[in-house]
Amino acid sequence: MINFSNTLIILNNDVPCELLKKKYSELLIPTIGILDFKKKKIYKKYNNIFLYSYQNYSFLLDLNDNILLKIQKYLNKNGILDINLYLNDKSNNNSGTSKKDHSKIEDINKILKRLRKECLYNGYINISAEQTMSENGIVINIKAENPDFNKSDDDNNLVSSDEEIYEKCEDKKKVVNRVCDNCTCGKKEKAMNLEKIKINDNEVEYNTENVVSSCGNCYLGDAFRCGSCPYKGLPAFQPGENVKLNLNNEQN
């Protein structure tokens, strides 16, 4: 059900449209002619704009004075443009009607295709086109919607979810900061960060309070350590735990 309280009627300047103008005026629905619509500025937007024309539709294809684009400016988001063209059939009483009817159908299809393209090129969506037979001609009806490209709350939630997933994936990535065996920059000494305390000739104690492990395997023992691990040779330990080594066992 169309709410005519927020509807504008655009009429071509021909006799049948003048009759429509009187009808809509009686219903207190705002109407305006094609020429006035092109020249005047409208200070309101509408949910529905109806355009009526008899015979003439060339003004819809005029790129220099693009009326479809101007109509879109006065449509609300998701507003509907409803184009109605009445093409009078003057060939009903002529001979060879079958050939002429076939040619006319091809012409109508070309008009429909062209008008749909023009609506699409001007940014309309959900475009539908149909033709119906009337008593003395053919009525072409094209409906098109003015899109609303603003993101909905659901779209924003989806974006947030994707961002969260991406951040979680980034957090799971491990950055392995390995130390070269022949380190000359001092990184190996810094990585060791072990305080060596000699208890006696046979025992040495290591304080692991400030130990830093980039891969997380340094605390697990030699079976899990890489070949260049600075803690290679130490038993498994917990950060902050003092590790005692028996030098006699090492020599053996």
Curated annotation (Swiss-Prot):
Pfam family, one: CIAPIN1
Positions that bind [2Fe-2S] cluster: 169, 180, 183, 185
Annotated compartments: Cytoplasm; Mitochondrion intermembrane space
Domain of life: Eukaryota
Region of interest (Linker), residue spans: 153-166
Binding site for [4Fe-4S] cluster: 215, 218, 226, 229
HAMAP family noted in UniProt: Anamorsin (MF_03115)
Full protein name: Anamorsin homolog
Higher taxonomy: Eukaryota, Sar, Alveolata, Apicomplexa, Aconoidasida
Name of the gene encoding the protein in the UniProt record: DRE2
